[in-house]
Amino acid sequence: MSDDQFHHPPPPSSMRHRSTSDAADGGCGEIVEVQGGHIVRSTGRKDRHSKVCTAKGPRDRRVRLSAHTAIQFYDVQDRLGFDRPSKAVDWLIKKAKTSIDELAELPPWNPADAIRLAAANAKPRRTTAKTQISPSPPPPQQQQQQQQLQFGVGFNGGGAEHPSNNESSFLPPSMDSDSIADTIKSFFPVIGSSTEAPSNHNLMHNYHHQHPPDLLSRTNSQNQDLRLSLQSFPDGPPSLLHHQHHHHTSASASEPTLFYGQSNPLGFDTSSWEQQSSEFGRIQRLVAWNSGGGGGATDTGNGGGFLFAPPTPSTTSFQPVLGQSQQLYSQRGPLQSSYSPMIRAWFDPHHHHQSISTDDLNHHHHLPPPVHQSAIPGIGFASGEFSSGFRIPARFQGQEEEQHDGLTHKPSSASSISRH
């Protein structure tokens, strides 16, 4: 058997045609009629991706063999002397033609059916698109939280998203007086020494009585700078308290106040103390006069003293937290305290007038030790002795200066402290 019998002549050009069916347009490729059947050439791809039309539909043009079958086949091809594997396959088919004819017949092959099957197998691969799963919209509550995070709590986000907010503020609109009281209490705890502290309701009740009702609205309209500062007062705070008696002489008018200095070691913001006269009237005052004699050395040695006792928590001012910026935040001191620095220093007007009398010009002033009250707990200066057992001198430095010009002397230890 010659080798030429296994080579099929190429089909005429008239047998080659493009399929005009819908299946062919779906991407099956070009159907080419060849001797003994049809092949489906893949359009735009290599020939090895083409399909052959069989009775059961298109199949791969290249047949994959197992390892041991491929070894045996290549041995037969080499023994036949063929240069192509297809020639060796044709020789095997012709030799087994009798056995092949004894097999059952296959159903007739219809090219249209093969094209439809090829299109059905290829169309899902071509038309299947990647479906993008769009995230479901968040619930309304989550949308509102996202808007608050985007635009800021209490800030106007442009008008459409927050139509109810007409002004910007650092306080959320839902904050009421109770939440403000809890917040203030957490940052500025109110500590009572001997009396039981009242409830938050009473504190806020007294606070609203002491301050105008539109305090929160003014706070919302003005962006307060609540940061603490370490700056000191350049010229010292204003007078902590004007003397209650206006009939004092020039000596008492020029009397220095307690802890008044250029550096202001306590660092209290006192820019609005003079304006809060109504609040000063509510502060309890405890004045204890020395029961000793009028010109003895005991009175001279005691001098003046200061007792700082905590007032009732109801009189504690919350102005360092909430208040008008033009009053409370015009000057900032180091780490303002939650207690109102109501430090007062005054002297007995009766004894003071006796001390400046013309009969005692060459003697020392005999001033009783006044006891003063402040909002700072735990600090006490009373006649040179602490209530807790600590004892300090009545005057911190120096001795009482004698009067040389016949006008004034240093009245007490308060003046010595205030000048340093």
Swiss-Prot record:
Description of what induces expression: Repressed by the miRNA miR-JAW/miR319.
UniProt GO MF annotations: DNA binding; DNA-binding transcription activator activity; DNA-binding transcription factor activity; sequence-specific double-stranded DNA binding
Subcellular location: Nucleus
Tissue expression per record: Expressed in cotyledons, particularly in the vascular region, in leaves, roots, buds, flowers and immature siliques.
UniProt main location, coarse: nucleus
Positions with biased composition (Polar residues): 410-420
UniProt keywords, alphabetically: Developmental protein, DNA-binding, Nucleus, Transcription, Transcription regulation
Domain TCP: residue ranges: 45-103
GO BP terms: cotyledon development; cotyledon morphogenesis; embryo development ending in seed dormancy; leaf development; leaf senescence; regulation of DNA-templated transcription
Subunit text: Interacts with AHL27 and AHL29. Interacts with SPL. Interacts with JGB. Interacts with GI (via N-terminus).
Name of the protein described by the UniProt record: Transcription factor TCP4
Species assigned in the record: Arabidopsis thaliana (Mouse-ear cress)
Taxonomy of the source species: Eukaryota, Viridiplantae, Streptophyta, Embryophyta, Tracheophyta
Gene assigned in the entry: TCP4
